[in-house]
Amino acid sequence: MGTATAYFLTQRGVRVTLIERGHIGAGATVASFGNIRRSGRYLPQMPLANRSLGLWSKLETWLGMDVEFRATGHLRLIFDHDGLALMQQFRKDALDWGLELEVLEPKDIRKRFPGLGPDAIAASFSPDDGSANPRLISPAFAGAAARGGATIHEQAHVSEISKTASGFEVVTSAGTFSADLLVNCAGAWGPDIARRFGEEVPITLAGPQMGVTEPLPHRILPVVGVWSKQHGAYLRQVERGNVVFGGAVARTQVGADGFAKIDPHNLSKQLQEVVKLVPALRQATIIRQWSGVEGYVEDMLPVMGPSGTTQGLFHAFGFCGHGFQLGPGVGDAMAELITTGSCTTPLAPFDIARFSA
């Protein structure tokens, strides 16, 4: 969120200093699956998701880099009647938010997506959704922001933040910086910054368990997921042939060192669910697993908008593992809000003041 916000602010003529505690893109983004989806999303996020989807196809031109955005569609398989009911209710509700899902019967799945979900009783398909490369997007935004005049400091650990007569002062291991405005895009650590200004946000830190196979013949075009009340599996095949997968098991806990670690004992259970989506993966070799820290706000909605206590402070954090698709829209919306004082995309559901009521 930080690099996208920095980029869109520079496009509006704002001088930006971006302070990164680690390396660009090494936080929740790099742990992301890379899913560009609106299907199954919390409905209050849909206007923001629609805004973001309209930007993804323009990023290669704007950022000067192919971030591997591909609108391959998002297929969500259904294996039981609970999943079918979930899909039907969401499909009905989502119509008012600008999303229309195709409903597929088993014969449609076999014809359009052979080899996927042979035991599925139905599926939904969102043709405009897809995926992008989470390892490329943050560096691409950061590079474009720098070319637009932004100053970027990596491995800059913040020790103090204070409100001054003219704005804010931030003391870091890379020096002390002053600015008129402060944007808190600190991800899972966003509540720590908000707390400095008297704003509490209930959040839990956890990490997804992700994995990737060896390169395989390219057979899986859409992103594939499941409609389920449980932690359903999901996967996609990248252009190099590797299949990236996740879900189906509980998120890993974050240790005292601030890192999320995978639990290798969960891999067997995870793969059992993955092969339900694509049985041909039963013989695939897993070459790597990973995780990363994500912040899950108590009500599973992000914090986004102006501070409720401090003039000139803005927040954009806590996207609960659903933020990758939203990133460009968040950056664009925050830049609009900061430079004009309002936003054409509704942000009220994400107001930090909801926790002080």
Regions found by a protein language model. Name each.
Residues 47-50, 77-86, 125-143, 153, ...:
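Short beta-strand to alpha-helix junction loop
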Residues 10-30:
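Glycine-rich FAD pyrophosphate-binding loop
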